[in-house]
Regions:
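Transmembrane core module of solute transporters
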Residues: 11-64, 68, 144, 164, ...
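A generic transmembrane-helix signature of 12-TM secondary carrier transporters
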Residues: 22, 84, 88-91, 106-107, ...
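C-terminal membrane-cytosol helix-exit motif in multi-pass small-molecule transporters
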Residues: 174-191, 207-219, 237-251, 488-496
């Protein structure tokens, strides 16, 4: 399904349209998370706020593999536009939501569209450009993905503070409108597609299993206890339908996920790395702002700005990884990535309340640089040397596993951080006596340290104990995250000797 657009001057407008789509999709969840406090204060229903994120993520992840396969079968353009229109419709509706129930429903609509944007955009780049140019373009796209993920919290805080939470959603409308125009007007795709049978059995069993798993992970420990009937029931249904999915896929003529791809060593390792990187990178975006706000006493907006060095590092890493794809093996570039990521995480894990913010900036630059490589290299590795009719499936699998890793990482590491914080706080307070001890026992929610006005009224002895407990719990999580990074390092060694071959090299090989 190669497009001729790569030879057309209008290709630059297609690229802009795709970049805008990635910008919205990657930024959406983090930008909304920043505004959730204000949204709850306005709409009420605190007990339902977790569903705002859960409903969107479930819809996105359930759609990713389906869109990837359908784009292979019937073309990229129509499904990218379908996703874009649904995303814009959902965004506009979210902005006018009058209740939490409405917002949750509209987030589902937004998520149905969002699941198409990221995987199909990366796939179109491979269709548009020859091998020697794909690296540069995937580096650019990976940079925008990394930029969007880190920019979300900052932009969300600024919009919520200076305008209103509604514009966290409305901002997508003009961006998406430009993307829609550029893709409709300039993306010329071949209309020659074979009529193929849709794997409805695989689609249904996969969607049901993903929906159950995602709801269990998103709501467990928040809305329901992990041992509750609801969560156990969701995990049980997930297991049943996931097993059914495997059985159905083995017999399907055109399976949603082609498991034969995992026999390719480069493809298989790229999927494992996407999952591991997703699960570890996200904790930096989540916990560094918390560290800055709780330990350093910075404002929410300032905490958002603190991620800028990591953003710059990831952009640089993504661009370098993309540019050198045709010159070095995937394995060699990912070794640089995983070493940088490991060093950065190790340094972050050794921080204390006395660590200067300048050093935090350096540590984030190192971490972001390492992670940035993965944004451009892993999608490219997933689609390397694959026939064009399998690219959508390959890249959607990679995007799905990265997103799944992010969800799992936030859930697991978030639970660990909360438990460690509570344990250390209890131990710390138990040894306090006198007026400070009484103040500690009478204190309400320790999370009050996030609020500047309340923080100033907490006795210094109590405040210092809370800060130390918070710092220790977050750095404990960073040190624990070294485990999946080490697993990633071992996985990288099995990537083989492949690299992106230029057009001339492929012609010489076939000729």
């Amino acid at each position: 399904m190669e497009s001729t657009a790569g030879k057309d001057p209008s290709t630059k407008f297609v690229v802009i349209g795709l970049l805008l789509g990635i910008l919205m999709s990657a930024m959406d969840n983090t930008i909304v998370a920043t505004a959730m406090g204000t949204i709850v204060a306005d709409l009420g229903s605190f007990d339902k706020f977790a569903w705002v994120t859960a409903s969107y993520m479930v819809a996105v992840m359930a759609g990713m593999p389906i869109y990837g396969k359908l784009s292979d079968m019937y073309g990229r353009k129509r499904f990218f536009l379908f996703g874009l229109i649904f995303f814009l419709l959902g965004s506009a509706l979210c902005g006018i939501a009058q209740s939490m129930n409405q917002l949750i429903l509209f987030r589902v609509i937004q998520g149905i569209g969002g699941g198409a944007l990221l995987p199909i955009a990366f796939t179109i780049i491979f269709d548009l450009f020859p091998p020697e140019k794909r690296g540069k373009m995937s580096g650019m796209f990976g940079a925008v993905f990394g930029l969007s993920s880190v920019l979300g919290p900052l932009l969300g805080a600024l919009i919520t503070d200076s305008i209103s939470w509604h514009w966290v959603f409305y901002i997508n409308v003009p961006i998406g409108a430009f993307s829609l125009f550029f893709i409709i007007r300039y993306y010329k795709e071949s209309l020659e597609h074979k009529k193929q049978k849709i794997d409805w059995g695989g689609a249904v069993t996969l969607v049901v299993s993903i929906v159950c798993l995602m709801f269990a992970l998103e709501l467990g420990g928040k809305t329901y206890d992990w041992g509750s009937v609801q969560i156990i029931g969701l995990f049980t249904v997930f297991a049943i339908f996931f097993i059914a999915f495997f059985i159905v896929e083995r017999k399907a003529e055109e399976p949603i996920i082609s498991f034969w791809m995992f026999k390719n060593r480069l493809f298989a390792t790229a999927q494992i790395l996407a999952f591991l990187y997703g699960g570890t990178f996200i904790i930096l975006a989540v916990f560094i702002p918390i560290f800055v706000q709780a330990v350093y006493g910075s404002s929410a907006t300032s905490a958002g700005f603190i991620l800028t060095p990591m953003m710059l590092g990831s952009v640089l890493g993504s661009m370098i990884g993309g540019i050198f794809q045709t010159k070095f093996r995937f394995r060699s570039l990912m070794i640089v990535s995983v070493i940088s990521f490991f060093i950065g995480m190790l340094l972050l894990g050794n921080m204390t309340p006395d660590t200067a913010r300048a050093w935090l900036t350096v540590f984030m630059l190192i971490s972001g640089f390492g992670v940035g490589f993965s944004f451009s290299l892993l999608p490219a590795a997933s689609m390397n040397n694959l026939d064009p009719r399998y690219r959508g499936t390959a890249n959607s699998t990679n995007s799905f596993l990265r997103s799944f890793g992010m969800t799992l990482g936030v859930t697991i590491f978030g639970t660990i951080q909360t438990n460690v914080f509570s344990s250390k706080l209890t131990d710390s307070f138990s040894g306090m006596k006198g007026s400070a001890g009484a103040a500690a026992q009478n204190m309400g929610d320790p999370q009050e340290i996030f609020q500047a006005g309340t923080r100033s009224h907490i006795p210094s002895a109590v405040l210092n104990r809370i800060i130390e407990a918070m710092s220790a719990s977050i750095t404990y999580v960073f040190m624990l995250a070294l485990i999946p990074i080490v697993i990633a390092a071992v996985t990288v060694l099995f990537m083989g000797k492949e690299r992106v071959k230029t057009t001339q090299e492929m012609e010489k090989k076939t000729g």
